[in-house]
């Protein structure tokens, strides 16, 4: 909190910024996985580094503020500031705060690197990823041939989950088809394929229904518009902070056409985290 967005605060000391909303978004990414957390702080650091040279020339790009309107007239507003406000910016203080925030982020990025690189063979440094693999293994042992869905809101988390699960399958000579559904990124790999192939929504649904794939790695994009009731088991690597979003996920399998008597949903969260407090 001491360094959080102090650069923006230095640029607009008299303006009310939506820091609470931005902090909420950052906390949700941190609660998703180590990988999502690292990506967030790395992106923020790069954003500041790229902006610093402009600050030294008393310039600020329109893209610096996430809430700037691309349709604003640049003669009137620059990055949410009128020209008169831009003239009054204390650039020396902006540069000082930006450099302080970058130094703080360097520390956190280094710490994230240490944690992520502390893995031993076969064990992910993130307990959430390990728990996902354990639940996956348990499910396919007890329910062979029954498909499942693995959900995460964030691509960074889902990429690592997919890597870990596929690595587990390869290590244990488990051959099964799977699909990845992340918004515009849709890929499918059948058990006898060497490479992924591009897929449409209907291809993934059809492959799940006819048993050619047993697991789908889903981002929030799969929470809407997909009928995946051929699966009766779901793992939520992160739990949506908006209850209606969780209901949408569950609705992919708990819907008309579900043939099983019950659906099983496992939610994973870090102990003592915001997620654990929300859903206890």
Can you name each region flagged by the protein language model?
Residues 1-175, 180-184, 209, 222-224, ...:
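Helicase motor interdomain insertion/brace
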Residues 224-239, 263-267:
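A short beta-strand element within the Helicase C-terminal
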Residues 205, 216-231, 250-258:
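SF2 helicase motor core recognition
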Residues 174-186, 239, 248, 262-272:
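Conserved beta-strand -> loop -> alpha-helix junction used to position metal-binding or nucleic-acid-contacting
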Residues 212, 244-250, 254-280:
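A conserved SF2-helicase RecA2
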Residues 175-219:
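Conserved helicase ATPase core of P-loop NTP-dependent helicases/translocases
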Residues 197, 202-203, 236, 243-246, ...:
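Amphipathic, heptad-repeat alpha-helical coiled-coil/stalk segments that mediate oligomerization
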